[in-house]
Structures are given as C-alpha cells and as structure tokens.
C-alpha cells in the first residue's frame, strides 16, 4: 500500500476536510468527488511503486509515465463525466501463512485503476482518520505493527491481560458485506459520486487465466483501496462497538488491539472475557462475518507467581507473527516476551533455501545482494527486544543454505568450509540485530 498521508502533507483542500472531520464527528460531507482532480491523480501516480506487478493490460508505472500529462488529463475527464470504467483485476495466489499447501488469492489491478483507488483512498482517509480509534493500528499514518506490539507488551506488563481472546475472522476481505459497507460510508459521506466510484472499485471482474468472474461480496485483496475499506468496516463492527457498548459493562479492565483484520482482546477478569467471547460471534454474524472456531480461543495469561522458580508461564498466544509468553528477566521478575512464530520462521527458512537452490548459478555478488535484502527485511520487522534467538536461528540457516547450494554449482570444484568462510569475509550477510524496541513506554 502507498504511504498514508499526514495532515502536513495533504493538499490544502484535503487538510480542511480532515480538520472539519476532527472538529465535527457527526458532520456529513456531501461533496468530495471534486477533490479527485488532476493534481490529486498526479499525487497518486507518484505514490505508486515502480516495481509493482502489472495488471491484465501489462502497463507499468514507467509505461504510464511516458505521456503522463495527457493520460492524467484523459483519466480525470472520464472520472468527471462518469465514463471511467475499472478494468478486471488479475488474480494470483500466494502461500497462506501457517497452512502448508494452502494459498490465498491476491488481486492485481491495472495501473490506471491503482491511481484512481489511491486518490479515492486519500479522500476517505481525510474523513475517517479522525474517526478511527486508538485501538486500530493497521494502514494508518504514524501507526504500525510495532506500535501495536508495544501497546500489547505494556498492557501485559501492567497485569491487565490475564485473559487473552485470540480471534480470527474467516476470509475477512472476501466476506465483507458490500451493501453494509456502503451504508456505513453514506452516513459520513452522502456523496453520490463517491458512492458510485467505490462501487466501481468493488464490483469489478476477476480474470483468472482465461476465465472471468464477478464476485458479489468482499473487497479484492491486494487492492490499494481494500485496507481503508476494511478499517472503516471494522471501525463500525468492532472498534466502536467494543469501546462504546462492551467496555462500560465490564467489571474489570479490558482492551482491544487491532491491526487490519488481526486482533486480540485482553481482559483482567475471566468472567468478562467469557461474556465477550459469547457475544462476539453474534456481533460478527450481523455483518456477514464469522470467526474460525479452531483459531478463536480464550487463553489464560496471568503473570506466574513470584515464587515459581523455573520454566515459563502458562499458555502462549500468537499475534502479528509473534508468539507471546512469560519469562524471567535477568533481575528475576516475570515479564512478557515474544519470539518469531514458529511457522513464520520456518516459512522464511524454506524461502531462503528455495531461493538459494533456484539462483545458485547467479554470480556471487548478485546472490549476496538478493539474500541481504531478504534478511534485512526480516530483521527490520522481527528484530524486537528479546527475539535474538529466533534471529540467530535464521542467520545460521541462511548461511547453511547458501553454503549447500554454492557447493553444488559445479561438479569439478567443490566449495570447502574454509573457502566459504573466506567468501563470507568478502560478502558478509547482514547480521541479526534488534532494530525495534517494544519495551517500556
């Protein structure tokens, strides 16, 4: 997804909309479509990635930019006169995390459609960003998964997460009810042109090989627009409901932490947790959503007794690619810790192994550069306090995979361990390191 905008980087017109939305939570915006002008479309063009996969028309950013002024003017005229048509998206499949052999669909829009989606996202964000609650961290300016992890660590450390409700919404982006989504948006933005444009981005054909289909529900995964539409939906379905209707009725403290459609709810009291678990499925069903029974559970996560000498705490739970557990600190106190989820770590090891095998005949500098990018990306996300062991495992396995497949480049000259050590001096792989602090405030 392109970078979300801050108030300072918005156009003056959008900044006024955002400021009014902040000051008047009940205000309605009847006329916003004119904000998707030539300048807004150019901004959206600039935010697109150069290396993004093309849609069914094969057009890349470089292709579209060859005659940018003409193409943007033409696009704006089609939008203004309501002649714009969203082209079908190209469907591909990527592996599903933690479920070997299973895949999830991803939709790739044509480049021009990405521009329209991003310009529309910019308008929706100006209105809804002031509305969104602090419990929401995904795809929002100034917020991140690391911020969600930091909040989670703080709540657990303070003893306010004795019970953790770990929930998984089944195929959220596929099951989202479009009619209810449009109704939610209409309450804040009763602008017919915006409604029609969102509809065109949702009711879009899907091209899979030679077969074309049209889905009646959900929002295409991979769409530039899907993250904010998902946030708007869950803002109404979950965030507001929990903070306004559920929290005031609980006997102890409780908190929701959500990143896109991934969320946990933490409770001080078991009875509160059980009551919420009972009503959560009914709440989701009202909006066409369902929780996966095998992935939705209530986990006891109390801090172990001070007198407990060894071992770890009670059960563990997973959130945003990490497994959370209790561990003794160097000072002897029980503290919450997290490590890379086992399935996520193994998936990364397998990817590196396959990459080294497939690309073993490339030059050493080319392999070194590509491996370095993959490892740095992993360390930048998973390099949080206390996760050094998982990072070290990946480092060791990456070196082992590279050595194994470099050995098999040639039948005549075998790469010895000594020569591989020398090679690593000239082409060192990135060292695992802690890149993000999630401890403290």
Explain the meaning of each model-derived region.
Residues 1-58, 62-69, 73:
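Non-catalytic, polymerase-adjacent accessory regions of viral genome-replication enzymes
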Residues 36-42, 88-92, 96-98, 202, ...:
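Core structural elements
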Residues 78-79, 83-93, 131-302, 316:
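Conserved polymerase palm-domain catalytic core
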Residues 105, 136, 214-219, 336-337, ...:
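Short, solvent-exposed helix-loop connector elements
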Residues 107, 111-119, 145, 163:
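Duplex nucleic acid-engaging cores and interfaces of nucleic-acid transaction enzymes
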Residues 203, 209, 291-362, 376:
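A conserved non-catalytic segment of reverse transcriptases
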Residues 255-259, 296-304, 370-374, 391-399, ...:
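A glycine-rich phosphate-binding loop feature that marks nucleotide/adenosyl-phosphate handling sites
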Residues 388-441:
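A terminal-accessory region detector
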């Amino acid at each position: 997804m392109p970078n979300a905008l801050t108030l300072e980087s918005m156009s003056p017109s959008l900044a006024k909309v955002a400021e009014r939305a902040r000051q008047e939570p009940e205000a309605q915006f009847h006329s916003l479509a004119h904000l998707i002008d030539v300048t807004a479309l150019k901004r959206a063009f600039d935010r697109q990635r150069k290396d993004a996969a093309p849609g069914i028309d094969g057009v890349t950013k470089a292709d579209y930019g060859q005659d940018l002024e003409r193409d943007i003017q033409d696009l704006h005229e089609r939008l203004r006169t309501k002649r714009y048509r969203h082209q079908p998206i190209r469907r591909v499949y990527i592996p599903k995390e933690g479920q070997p052999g299973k895949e999830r669909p991803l939709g790739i829009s044509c480049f021009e459609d990405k521009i329209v989606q991003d310009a529309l996202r910019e308008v929706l964000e100006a209105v809804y960003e002031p509305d969104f609650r602090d419990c929401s961290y995904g795809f929002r300016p100034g917020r991140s998964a690391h911020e969600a992890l930091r909040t989670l660590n703080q709540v657990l450390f303070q003893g306010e997460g004795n019970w953790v409700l770990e929930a998984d919404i089944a195929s959220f982006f596929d099951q989202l009810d479009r009619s209810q989504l449009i109704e939610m948006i209409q309450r804040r933005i009763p602008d017919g042109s915006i409604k029609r444009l969102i509809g065109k981005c949702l009711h879009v054909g899907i091209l899979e090989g030679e077969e074309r289909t049209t889905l009646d529900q959900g929002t295409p995964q991979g769409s530039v627009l899907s993250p904010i539409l998902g946030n708007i939906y869950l803002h109404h379905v979950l965030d507001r409901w929990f903070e306004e209707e559920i929290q005031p009725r609980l006997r102890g403290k409780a908190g929701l932490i959500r990143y896109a459609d991934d969320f946990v709810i933490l409770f001080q009291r078991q009875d509160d947790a059980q009551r919420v678990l009972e009503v959560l499925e009914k709440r989701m069903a009202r909006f066409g959503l369902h929780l996966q029974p095998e992935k939705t559970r209530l986990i006891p996560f109390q801090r172990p007794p001070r007198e407990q000498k060894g071992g770890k705490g009670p059960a563990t739970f997973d959130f945003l690619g990490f497994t959370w557990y209790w561990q003794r600190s160097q000072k002897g106190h029980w503290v919450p810790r997290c490590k890379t989820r086992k399935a996520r770590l193994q998936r990364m090891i397998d990817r590196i192994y396959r990459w080294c095998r497939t690309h073993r005949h490339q030059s050493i500098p080319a392999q070194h550069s590509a491996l370095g990018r993959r490892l740095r990306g992993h360390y930048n996300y998973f390099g949080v306090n206390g996760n050094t062991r998982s990072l070290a495992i990946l480092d060791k396995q990456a070196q082992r995979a590279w050595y194994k497949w470099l050995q098999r480049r040639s039948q005549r000259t075998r790469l010895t361990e000594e020569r591989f050590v020398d090679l690593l001096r000239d082409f060192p792989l990135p060292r695992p390191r802690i890149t993000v602090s999630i401890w403290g405030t």
